[in-house]
Amino acid sequence: MGKVVGIDLGTTNSCVSIMEGGEPKVIENSEGVRTTPSMVAFTNQGERLVGQAAKRQAVTNPTNTLYAIKRLIGRRFSDPLTAKDQGLVPYKIVKADNGDAWVEADGKKMSPSECSAMILQKMKQTAEDYLGESVSEAVITVPAYFNDAQRQATKDAGRIAGLEVLRIINEPTAAALAYGLDKKDGQTIAVFDLGGGTFDISILEIGDGVFEVKSTNGDTFLGGEDFDMAIIDYLADQFKKENSIDLRKDSMALQRLKEAAEKAKIELSSSNQTDINLPFITADASGPKHLNLSLTRAKLESLVDELVQRTLAPCRTALKDAGMTAADIDEVILVGGMTRMPKVQAVVGQFFGKEPHKGVNPDEVVAIGAAIQGGVLKGEVQDVLLLDVTPLSLGIETLGGVFTKLIEKNTTVPTRKSQVFSTAADNQSAVTIRVAQGEREMFSDNKTLGQFDLVGIAPAPRGMPQIEVTFDIDANGMVHVSAKDKGTGKEQSIHIEASGGLTSEEIDRMVHEAESHAEEDAKKRALIEARNNADSLVYSSEKSLKEHSDKLDDALKNQITAAIEDLKAVMPKEDPEAISSKTQALMELSMKMGEQIYKENPEAAGMDPEAAAHAAGMHGGAATGGGDGANKHGKGAEDVVEAEFEEVNDDKK
């Protein structure tokens, strides 16, 4: 049985680890270093360089040296953050035929997955050189807030690199595994993971081999690269003041600034001042120009204060979602190279009211956790149970543009949820299932992941077909959706992939807007549900009136006809209370109609008085989730809610 490697595929650096003798071990690369720069370069000679070799030549070959590729993985070219990234890097970001963001180097267009695969191949080779045998299986880590497209793209990168990816594991969860493997007593911990390109915060309860994630949040476009850019902008602005030359327009000068910024940032974690000297950075008609200035820790902290403060909003949300306060956290674990910055440590300590735990190596702990997870999957590590969560709610569009959630955010994965819907029109032979992620009440306010059609539905009156929609999120956090017509057995499924990733800004916007627009959303939904109820009742009442006209007295027929017209008149209005009131009035008359039909010919009706009343039009709860009087289709049928496909109320099964 071959070894399973644990790989931390980072934005700035990557790391590989294995289980050896029951203990995780980080493997040094061919340069003798335990972390490898996540960089790929293509030389004029057609040679491909990965890791430290690529980093060494970046200044002289900036347009063909690719770094921070992880920020593009699973993203669309039209994504606003792709445009932001274009202003930060010297290499070309181009639009692929499918609309994804790709990169171009040495005249060749490549997907971010392909570039990431080159880094994974380097990590694979590092492990093989140490073990003296081939490696084919891996556990790869991703930010907890990565969406489905980004996770799928990461898994694709593993496959391109020749690895069978046994599991995609969230970085904070991997760090918690490494920290808590030997912890027997129960603890509640917060994993604060600020890396090179992404930020995650996860709240976990750990103890006696059980690692349960209570909530997770984050920002997939916040990390060390942004801190570097803040320094680069400062250096470029200072130089421009003195020399009237913008160094950001020179790709080679920009690469030198990046190296200097990264070096200064690291030095200022242990000293109060550093000197930045870049001779011959550029030239003009008067001759060569040199950049020479001092940067203090205080100045650096003022430059990046806004970035550090941005980490706190996800922390507050994660605590709120977990139903906890900062006082409930026993330990705060710092993960990612940026947590070495004193300013970050101070802000985290102040927020949680306790000194952060610094007993783990922030650059290696994620890879170690990935190796432990590999050991768990292979049976080398016993008595460990890992319970992770999905970061966003998942659902589908139903009648009126409502977003019907099937799986709520922070639900433990793997998970599977099914719900039965129905058609919205008579003889409807196909339905379109549209899938989204988000927290808003209306589908259009959330992020569409994809859609598919279920065709071949047998012709039937609306509300009769039973269409079971199933959401399945696997242990990798990847989404599968299927729909099945329970009558015909027809089934259609979609594996959501590379449909344009959700950005951290979009996620934050969804959550914040969901909170600020909660009242507005509730009113909008109430109006749609009231109209759906009314429409369903009008339809069934008119049908019953037509079919059983000879069994009803004229007075009741006139009353029902008038009530139907009254209800139709108020339905277009933006007044859910008025619609509900008229719906209730028609429902009461429908009950009387059912009673008359039953009294007139109980055997022909073939049902009890309550069922007769239903047949006569008692469909008042049809679109609300199956309240009292929800439509029943035959004996033993499930209560369904009329939506774009009617929703079954599971509680009444």
Swiss-Prot record:
Q: Which residues carry this modification: Phosphothreonine?
A: T198
Identify the Pfam families for this entry: HSP70
Q: Which SUPFAM superfamilies match?
A: Actin-like ATPase domain, Heat shock protein 70kD (HSP70), C-terminal subdomain, Heat shock protein 70kD (HSP70), peptide-binding domain
Q: Where is the composition biased (Acidic residues)?
A: 639-653
Q: What induces it?
A: By stress conditions e.g. heat shock.
InterPro entries under this entry?
ATPase_NBD, Chaperone_DnaK, Heat_shock_70_CS, HSP70_C_sf, HSP70_peptide-bd_sf, Hsp_70_fam
Q: Where is this region: Disordered?
A: 608-653
Q: Name one GO molecular function term.
A: ATP-dependent protein folding chaperone
Biased composition annotated in UniProt, kind: Gly residues: 618-629
Q: What CDD domains does this protein map onto?
A: ASKHA_NBD_HSP70_HSPA9
Q: Does the keyword Oxidoreductase apply?
A: no
- PROSITE patterns given in the database record: HSP70_1, HSP70_2, HSP70_3
What keywords tag this UniProt record?
ATP-binding, Chaperone, Nucleotide-binding, Phosphoprotein, Stress response
Q: Which domain of life is it from?
A: Bacteria
- Renumbered to this chain, the Low complexity biased-composition regions fall at 608-617
| Role of this protein | Acts as a chaperone.
Identify its protein family. Answer: Belongs to the heat shock protein 70 family.
Name-wise, this protein is Chaperone protein DnaK
